[in-house]
């Protein structure tokens, strides 16, 4: 069976800091290609959103991922924060669409479950597991670790989906 190497970009959107993590995945193995944070300037929101879109698009053009994964919006008590997060997420989705990149979405609970094995894991636990799973020299910053965790979650989830489809095909 052929297991091609796939490149996945994970995106953890934020209006001030957007984390990104780019991994390769082949079969049950994954490795880190790049990770970091897009720290927006202290401009008005529209300029920050444009910066997020532009920098993510540049990363996509440089690293040529096959797929993207992003965290779903979760419920906030502060409506303004939720709105800004949704707008940052929209800027990230525009960048992926501009590069014709398919996008998968995962809840925070799904991501933590896939990476830590516990859906209510702390940020520190996610950082630690990303550090271990990708054999990084040191733990990445929280936003980048979250983005790498999103990419790892997608690698695992999509691999399991492929196996289920193959098994279903053998049953019919």
Curated annotation (Swiss-Prot):
Catalytic residues of the enzyme: 12, 71, 143
A GO biological-process term: DNA repair
Reaction(s) catalysed by this chain's protein: Endonucleolytic cleavage at a junction such as a reciprocal single-stranded crossover between two homologous DNA duplexes (Holliday junction)
Domain of life: Bacteria
Sorted UniProt keywords: Cytoplasm, DNA damage, DNA recombination, DNA repair, DNA-binding, Endonuclease, Hydrolase, Magnesium, Metal-binding, Nuclease
Cofactor binding summary note: Binds 2 Mg(2+) ion per subunit.
Subcellular location: Cytoplasm
EC class: hydrolase
E.C. number(s) listed in UniProt: 3.1.21.10
Pfam families assigned to the protein according to its UniProt record, in alphabetical order: RuvC
CC terms in the record's Gene Ontology section: cytoplasm; Holliday junction resolvase complex
Keyword Cytoplasm: yes
Binding site for Mg(2+) 2: 71
Binding, Mg(2+) 1: 12, 143
Matches recorded under InterPro entries: RNaseH-like_sf, RNaseH_sf, X-over_junc_endoDNase_Mg_BS, X-over_junc_endoDNase_RuvC
CC cofactor: Mg(2+)
UniProt xrefs under NCBIfam families: ruvC
Function (record text): The RuvA-RuvB-RuvC complex processes Holliday junction (HJ) DNA during genetic recombination and DNA repair. Endonuclease that resolves HJ intermediates. Cleaves cruciform DNA by making single-stranded nicks across the HJ at symmetrical positions within the homologous arms, yielding a 5'-phosphate and a 3'-hydroxyl group; requires a central core of homology in the junction. The consensus cleavage sequence is 5'-(A/T)TT(C/G)-3'. Cleavage occurs on the 3'-side of the TT dinucleotide at the point of strand exchange.
Subunit structure: Homodimer which binds Holliday junction (HJ) DNA. The HJ becomes 2-fold symmetrical on binding to RuvC with unstacked arms; it has a different conformation from HJ DNA in complex with RuvA. In the full resolvosome a probable DNA-RuvA(4)-RuvB(12)-RuvC(2) complex forms which resolves the HJ.
PANTHER family, alphabetized: CROSSOVER JUNCTION ENDODEOXYRIBONUCLEASE RUVC
Protein name as it appears in the record: Crossover junction endodeoxyribonuclease RuvC
Annotated gene: ruvC
């Amino acid at each position: 069976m052929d297991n091609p190497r796939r490149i996945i970009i994970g995106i953890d959107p934020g209006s001030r800091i957007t984390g990104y993590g780019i991994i390769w995945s082949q079969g049950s193995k994954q490795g880190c290609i790049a990770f970091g944070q897009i720290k927006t300037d202290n401009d008005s929101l529209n300029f920050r959103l444009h910066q997020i879109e532009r920098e993510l698009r540049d990363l996509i053009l440089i690293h040529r991922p096959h797929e993207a994964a992003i965290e779903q919006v979760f419920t906030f008590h502060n409506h303004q924060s939720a709105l800004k997060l949704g707008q940052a997420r929209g800027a990230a989705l525009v960048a992926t669409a501009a590069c014709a990149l398919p996008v998968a979405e995962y809840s925070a609970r799904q991501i933590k479950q896939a990476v830590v094995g516990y859906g209510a894991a702390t940020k520190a636990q996610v950082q630690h597991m990303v550090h271990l799973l990708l054999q990084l020299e040191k733990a990445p910053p929280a936003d980048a670790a979250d983005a790498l965790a999103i990419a790892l979650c997608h690698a695992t989830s999509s691999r399991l989906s492929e196996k289920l489809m193959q098994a279903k095909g053998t049953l019919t």
